[in-house]
Structures are given as C-alpha cells and as structure tokens.
C-alpha cells in the first residue's frame, strides 16, 4: 500500500524444477528448448497488470492505529526521546551481566528484536544465541540463531546492542556469551516475550532443497517490498525460511539496504522519505525527497550522499510540460520516473542531478501515454554508482542498460546496452555496445548490478549482473516489434515460461559485450532481482510475480528454493549479513 506521509490516511494503489545455466547458455535455441519444457509454479497475471490484486484496500481500525504508530517511528525527535528514556531507566536500575537491561523493540523498528545493555567488570567480547523452538502440532521446529552484535567482537566493559532473530509470539530464551581476553568464556541468560507479527506475512516460508551440495551463503534474505494493499514491512528470513525480522515502513517499499559502515542501515520508508536506523535499532536520520517522489532504487556517491531515482520535477513549469504530454489536469501529478536526485545526508538538501528527458528529448517526445495516464517513457528501475560521477541505469521501458558519465557536470551517455533496432534513428546508434555471440537481448530487465574486478576494471572490462525478465512490451512504444530482441523473448505475457539471471562482460575498449553466465528461472514479466552472494559465486534470483526466490551454485544448480504467499508479488530479494 502506498501511504501519504504524516497522519493523512488517504490510500492509493501503485504498482519447481529450475534449469541450470549449462542449457541456458546454448543461446536462443537452447532458451526455446527450455521454454518448451515449462516451469512449475510460475504465476502469470494479465498483460500490463503487474499481477495486480483485487484485494480490498480498506484497513481495519487496528491497522489504521498501527499505521499511525509506524508514522511516529520515523520521527527523529520521538526516537531521541525514547533513547533518553532508555538511558534513564538503565541508569536507575542495578543491571548487570547476569541481569541485563532488556527492552523489547523499544524503537519500533523490528518486531523480532530487543535492546540489551549491561556492564562487565573486565573487558570482554560478546555474542548471543536465541534458543530454538520444538515442533508442537502444526507449529514448526525453529533452530537456534546466533550472532555477534555490532561492536561485540571488540573487548569492552560497557555493552549496548540489539538482539535480532527472535521468534514471534514466543517467550524467547537468549544466552549471552562473554569471552575474556585470556579466552575464558562465561554465559548468562534472559528471556524476552515477543508479540505476534504485525503484518500478514508467513512465519515460515515453504522451502525446497535443490540438487546442489554447495552451502547457502551466510546472511538473511530481505524481502524488499510486496506492494501489499495493507500495511508494508521489510521482512528478513533465514536460510531455513524462518522469519527473523519484521521492519515496519510507512508505505511503498524498502527497495534495498545501504550501509554507511558505522553499523547503521539506510532505506526508503515511503515515497518521499529515506531513513537511517543505527545498530541499536534507533532511527537517527530521516531525509525528505522534497518535491520529488522516490521509486525503485538509490545508491551512495563518493561523498556518501544519496543518489535517488525520482519522479516529478520540482518546478511547476516542468510539471506543466509533463502534465500536458499526459493530458492531465493541473492539480494532478504525473509519474515519469526519469529523474535522478541527490539528497545531501548532512544538510538534507535535495537537488536535481539528471533529467533523462534532457538527454533523450526526442525519445520522450515520441512516447505514448500509458493506460494509467502516466508518461512512463523510460522507467528507470536501478541505479549503480561506479565512482567519479559515473552511473549505470536500467531502463525497463526501453530494455536498455545506460551508462552515464559526469552526472554532476554535463551528464553524457557513454554507452547503451540494448536493441540496435529500437535505437535506430535516435542519434545514439554509435553509443550502442555490440553484442557478441548468439543470445536474445534483455527484455524489461531489473536489478542491474555492477561487478568490478580488480584485475580487469582498470582495462575497461567488467561484469554486469541483471535479472532479464524476458518480456518484450512497452506501452510507451506500441509500434515497436519487441520480437526483434531475439527468438526467446516473450511478447505475449500469457505465454511466458521463463526469465533469466544473467551476467555479461562489458568491454569498453572494443565497445562490445558478451553473455558469460545465465540461469533460466520461473517467468516474471515485471519486478524481480538477481544478486551475487557468498564466496563461491552463487547467485540469488527472485522471480517476483512467481513469488519465489532461489539460491543457485556457481554451476547453476539450485541450492534451495523459497516460496512466499505474497498478495501480489515479491518486488526484490537481496541477501545481507545482518
């Protein structure tokens, strides 16, 4: 559900057996063979619907009350007051290693966490283990969960941290292990009661073991948005499919987590707010995107400021131009998704960095208005910072990866990875990288990721990972034949059988790119993600509209597959060591 910020409660809608890369790398012919085999468990919606749900958008009175509480969570002054209260309660109390100060999710940022604080007489490192749960009736067994908290690996006498991974609606037993500098360890325990989950997600996902013996990568799977018609959360699941975190957000999606390096994490919490949550669970910064609405993705630049994909130009004149193109009344906003803004994390200032309409004016002018009344002519869904004013952008509507340089000066196209037929007559034909080999081109790709290599980046060669939705369609350009992207590309949504996790090598010296790795996965015409995980070149691929994600080994064999009963789809799944 997309909620307006503040206390305004008005709501509006937005948006089995898996095959190895050995066969997929056979090119278009191999891809067609895979398509003929079919994939089990693929969820297919109507063309252009994005799998929209018919569920009611009405919240219960309890959910409305909870949403007001969630809005209050992202108020820095209120969070500061909570921290001051915790400090006072701790100072008043006689707490110790044997009887630590414990508060269950005092900041309201993770239902399955608690705040812990105590002192020791000697300098020790600290770790903790959350006890498991035995299987009883329909309640599944839950394994133990162990972590070293932020700063816990540094010997100290004062200890303040967050415990994560608690079991919902359960009296959790937590064991603390303190290790002295001579190596001697001692333990103490406490219990903390958690409430039931606040959202409607599953406590336990359905998990199917794959044929690979490669261990799953460490970390937690972050479900970064489901576009529910109810309340919105970021969910964290462990490798067994057990929920280990429930982070409430005001609305929309959390998109991805960014880590400044101080133990905190930064994520979007609504269409106009980014938030920073420190290692103890306290919201310490909230940045507004001002006259812009964020969407899809964001990244750090070299100075640690936020580059955010955005819609709606700040000036009324720019808005009028887009409204006129979309034939909308002056009072209506029009989503264009063609801007990159910068949010200064020190001052909070917001500035426009890139307007893609200025770079591709003829393309924008040729685009048709979408059925929802928006001018979604380029639909940027990923941004990757390469350093030195250079970014990679993923354009779903043009099925093109775009490299821009000098974004803080004169933004310039360095190269395009897309269809030569689509870009014919655009004036950017010379910017196209030439595909080497026999493979269908990307169609509607998402989750583009820059994978530098110390040995090759300096020579102008690097890898690009992405989720190829393999769905050629764009309301903005109805006359273009997307079948020209290759024989394997799906142009009829109802006939989609598979998408791909793909890795390309881009060579800027020869102005070419080649497909070096590919995994065929359940079809998802929209949303979805791919990520390189662990130390063994495994790939995590989420097919959002199929509501499934799988971790594959380096040979393309599935290690484990997870299924989620999302209302619409899973927007994106990334794995983080939290």
Name the predicted role of every residue range:
Residues 45-53:
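Bacterial Sec signal peptide processing site at the extreme N-terminus
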Residues 57-133, 155-160, 164-171, 175-578:
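Histidine-/acidic-rich catalytic cores in large beta-rich domains
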């Amino acid at each position: 559900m997309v909620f307006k910020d503040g206390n305004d409660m008005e709501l509006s809608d937005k948006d089995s057996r898996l095959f190895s890369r050995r066969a997929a790398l056979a090119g278009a012919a191999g891809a067609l063979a895979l398509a003929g085999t079919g994939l089990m468990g693929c969820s297919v919606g109507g063309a252009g619907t994005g799998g929209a749900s018919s569920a009611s958008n009405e919240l219960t009175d309890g959910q409305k009350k909870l949403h007001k509480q969630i809005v209050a969570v992202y108020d820095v002054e209120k969070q500061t007051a909570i921290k001051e209260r915790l400090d006072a309660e701790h100072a008043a109390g006689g707490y110790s290693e044997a009887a630590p100060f414990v508060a269950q999710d005092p900041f309201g940022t993770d239902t399955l966490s608690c705040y812990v604080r105590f002192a020791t007489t000697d300098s020790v490192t600290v770790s903790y283990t959350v006890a498991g749960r035995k299987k009883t009736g329909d309640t599944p067994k839950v394994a133990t969960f162990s972590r070293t908290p932020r700063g816990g690996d540094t010997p100290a006498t004062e200890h303040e941290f967050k415990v994560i991974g608690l079991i919902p609606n359960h009296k959790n037993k937590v064991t603390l292990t303190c290790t002295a500098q001579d190596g001697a360890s001692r333990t103490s325990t406490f219990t903390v009661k958690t409430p039931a989950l606040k959202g409607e997600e599953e406590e336990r996902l359905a998990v199917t073991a794959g044929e690979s013996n490669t261990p799953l990568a460490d970390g937690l799977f972050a479900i970064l948005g489901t576009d529910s018609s109810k309340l919105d959360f970021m969910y964290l699941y462990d490798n067994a499919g057990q929920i280990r975190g429930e982070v409430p957000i005001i609305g929309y999606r959390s998109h991805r987590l960014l880590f400044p390096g101080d133990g905190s994490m930064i994520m979007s919490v609504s269409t106009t707010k980014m938030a920073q949550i420190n290692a103890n669970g306290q919201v310490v910064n909230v940045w507004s995107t001002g006259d812009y609405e964020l969407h899809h993705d964001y990244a750090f630049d070299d100075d640690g400021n936020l580059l955010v994909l955005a819609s709606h130009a700040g000036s009324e004149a720019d808005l009028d131009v887009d409204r006129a193109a979309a034939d909308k009344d002056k009072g209506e906003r029009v989503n264009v998704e063609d801007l990159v803004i910068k949010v200064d994390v020190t001052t909070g200032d917001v500035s426009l960095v890139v307007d893609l309409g200025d770079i591709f004016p003829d393309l924008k002018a040729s685009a048709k208005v979408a059925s929802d009344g928006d001018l979604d002519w380029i639909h940027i869904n990923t941004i990757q910072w390469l350093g030195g004013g250079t970014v990679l952008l993923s354009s779903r509507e043009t099925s093109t990866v775009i490299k821009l340089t000098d974004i803080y000066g004169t933004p310039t196209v360095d190269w395009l990875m897309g269809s030569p037929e689509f870009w014919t007559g655009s004036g950017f034909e010379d910017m196209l990288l030439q595909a080497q080999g026999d493979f269908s081109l990307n169609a509607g790709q998402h989750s583009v990721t820059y994978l530098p290599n110390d040995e090759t980046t300096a020579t102008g060669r690097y890898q690009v990972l992405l989720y190829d939705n393999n769905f050629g369609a764009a309301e903005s350009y109805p006359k273009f034949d997307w079948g020209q992207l290759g024989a394997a590309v799906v142009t009829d949504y109802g006939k989609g059988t598979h998408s791909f996790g793909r890795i390309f090598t881009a060579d800027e010296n020869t102005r070419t790119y080649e497909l070096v790795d590919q995994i065929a996965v359940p079809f998802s015409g929209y949303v979805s993600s791919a990520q390189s995980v662990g130390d063994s070149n495994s790939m995590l691929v989420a097919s959002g509209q199929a509501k499934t994600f799988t971790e594959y080994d380096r040979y393309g064999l599935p290690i484990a597959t997870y299924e989620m009963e999302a209302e619409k789809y899973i927007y994106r799944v990334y794995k983080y060591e939290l």
